[in-house]
Amino acid sequence: MRDKKFRYFVTSKRRKIRYSQVNSKKKLMVIFFHGFMSDMEGKKPKSFEKFSKKIQTGFLRFEYSGHGKSSNKLTEGNISKWTDDAYQLINSKINKKKVIFIGSSMGSWIALKLIPKFRKQMAGFIGIGSAPDFTDELMWKKFPRNIKDIINKKGIYNVKNEYGDPYPITKQLIKDGKKNKILKKFMNCFNLPVFLFHGNKDKS
């Protein structure tokens, strides 16, 4: 399962994670975490990869299971599984290099959960339209009763998406998201440089 530009990493749970890695002699690697229902071939990861090549740092982009061309179905995934996908891949690739995490939307949630695991190697964090806890704060708490009933009874509901296909929100995704909430918990970023960017016209 391989193509010319990308490779696949197999996790301990046998999930096949597609990734692209640019190596560098510098002891720094930039790692991009994409958002929900996104992939690693969008404008943001490609732009950051181009910039990383220009300044000659390493760069890693990848797709969680159920996203892009990685294995499994999107509806089988959740924050715990996607965090584990990211952790196993990153842990196998960075060696002793310092890392800068860049998270887009849901990617920031997953990146923030991994900062403590890589704290000795963290050099910075950049969040773009960050959406930690979105399954609870932006979805479940704002869903009307009829939608909550559908999710509880059928296990899934397709939420309208102004950017493309509907978001398939599953009961297990909501339940798992509650276990992974971080916004109301103390988080030690270990004195990291942190930059957060959010568009004023972002309706989401």
Predicted regions and their residues:
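N-terminal cap/lid segment of alpha/beta-hydrolase-fold proteins
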Residues: M1-S24
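Catalytic nucleophile-loop/oxyanion-hole region of alpha/beta-hydrolase
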Residues: H67-I94
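Short beta-strand element of the alpha/beta-hydrolase
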Residues: K27-G35
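Active-site nucleophile elbow and catalytic-triad environment of alpha/beta-hydrolase enzymes
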Residues: P166-F186, L192
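Gly/Ala-rich beta-loop-alpha elbow adjacent to hydrolase catalytic centers
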Residues: G103-A111
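Conserved alpha/beta-hydrolase
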Residues: P45, E49-S71
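Hydrolase active-site cap/lid region
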Residues: K120-I169
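Short beta-strand/loop motif that positions the catalytic acidic residue
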Residues: C189-F190, L196-H198, D202
